[in-house]
Amino acid sequence: RLIERGVIEKYGDKNGCFRLIDSEAQNIDWFNSSINNIDIKYPFGIEHYVHTMPKNIIVVAGSPNAGKTAFMLNIVAMNMDKFKINYFSSEMAAMELRSRLQKFDFPISKWRFTAKERSHSFADVIKPEEINIIDFMELTEDFWKVGGMIRSVYDKLSTGIAIIALQKAHGATMARGGVGSLEKP
């Protein structure tokens, strides 16, 4: 009877497996919306070529040792006086992070951001209204799941953004996860 009323539907190939039908969708009030770019700065003046909007996901893909962390730390340096920034590192502890920050042309005491060690479940720690930098989103198996992982981060954002570093194999044109890594950005 629940199937006939449109409450559930058969799910998968196994007998007796069903799922609740979610018929709700949030309205997009495009008519009353204003266009507010986030005035974020990027290395190489990238902001002159792209407009960053609330809830945007920016993916930075590169092979190992290509400079992804340096790129991410430069974003922090260029924006920390204007925005609250959360930096989630999956590969650096305090000593290495401090060593990298000391290479910049200003005193270590001038750095203003929150650094956290994190290598999984990033959507659980995202700050919805702030800049969230994930350096990097590790994919050790099931690379095809990256699209869902990025989607989970997107769903947590409200007016903030996420900048996500992904590994790429040497010579590859896309990050691990292939086209799935391009679906949300």
Language-model segments: which ranges?
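Short gly/ser/thr-rich secondary-structure transition/capping motifs
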Residues: D39-F44, F113-E117, G171-A172
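Conserved inter-motif catalytic segment of the P-loop NTP-binding fold
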Residues: H51, S63, N79-G160
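Phosphate-binding/switch region of NTP-binding enzymes
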Residues: G147-P185
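The Walker A/P-loop phosphate-binding site
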Residues: F18-F104
